Curated annotation (Swiss-Prot):
<dbReference type="Pfam" id="PF07654">
    <property type="entry name" value="C1-set"/>
</dbReference>
<dbReference type="InterPro" id="IPR013783">
    <property type="entry name" value="Ig-like_fold"/>
</dbReference>
<dbReference type="GO" id="GO:0002474">
    <property type="term" value="P:antigen processing and presentation of peptide antigen via MHC class I"/>
</dbReference>
<keyword id="KW-1015">Disulfide bond</keyword>
<feature type="signal peptide">
    <location>
        <begin position="1"/>
        <end position="20"/>
    </location>
</feature>
<dbReference type="InterPro" id="IPR036179">
    <property type="entry name" value="Ig-like_dom_sf"/>
</dbReference>
<dbReference type="InterPro" id="IPR003597">
    <property type="entry name" value="Ig_C1-set"/>
</dbReference>
<dbReference type="GO" id="GO:0042612">
    <property type="term" value="C:MHC class I protein complex"/>
</dbReference>
<keyword id="KW-0391">Immunity</keyword>
<keyword id="KW-0732">Signal</keyword>
<keyword id="KW-0964">Secreted</keyword>
<dbReference type="InterPro" id="IPR003006">
    <property type="entry name" value="Ig/MHC_CS"/>
</dbReference>
<feature type="disulfide bond">
    <location>
        <begin position="45"/>
        <end position="100"/>
    </location>
</feature>
<feature type="domain" description="Ig-like C1-type">
    <location>
        <begin position="25"/>
        <end position="114"/>
    </location>
</feature>
<comment type="similarity">
    <text>Belongs to the beta-2-microglobulin family.</text>
</comment>
<dbReference type="GO" id="GO:0005576">
    <property type="term" value="C:extracellular region"/>
</dbReference>
<protein>
    <recommendedName>
        <fullName>Beta-2-microglobulin</fullName>
    </recommendedName>
</protein>
């Protein structure tokens, strides 16, 4: 019985220590296909390597939140860091600017990464 209690305590302590770890997300913004003005495409924001899992991701068009956005399920890597993909259909043109805004406990203010049509 004492062995079980010790093992249970060690498991709880290791899980508690995992919550103390914080890693900022890596943010990548890209289109599914090469940008071609006037042709439908998909805008992707891949957020990876972050911990803890609480995160807020918004896709932006000219600084305003895009409402019709889908995302993958929250998943984790071998190192227990998390990753997500947010995406939406869009039609690129010369005048509109697209970006991904991420809020995470590791950032003092939300971080915004602009889409570079040449990437």
């Amino acid at each position: 019985m004492a062995r079980f209690v010790v093992v249970a305590l060690l498991v709880q302590l290791s899980l508690f220590g995992l919550e103390a770890i914080q890693h900022p997300p890596k943010i990548q913004v890209y289109s599914r296909y090469p940008a071609d003005n006037g042709k439908p495409n998909f805008l992707n924001c891949y957020v990876s390597g972050f911990h803890p899992s609480d995160i807020e991701v918004d896709l932006l068009k000219n600084g305003k939140k895009i409402e019709k956005v889908e995302h993958s399920d929250l998943s984790f890597s071998k190192d227990w860091s998390f990753y997500l993909l947010y995406y939406t259909e869009f039609t690129p043109n010369e005048k509109d600017e697209y970006a991904c805004r991420v809020s995470h406990v590791t950032f003092s203010t939300p971080k915004t990464v602009k889409w570079d049509r040449n990437m």
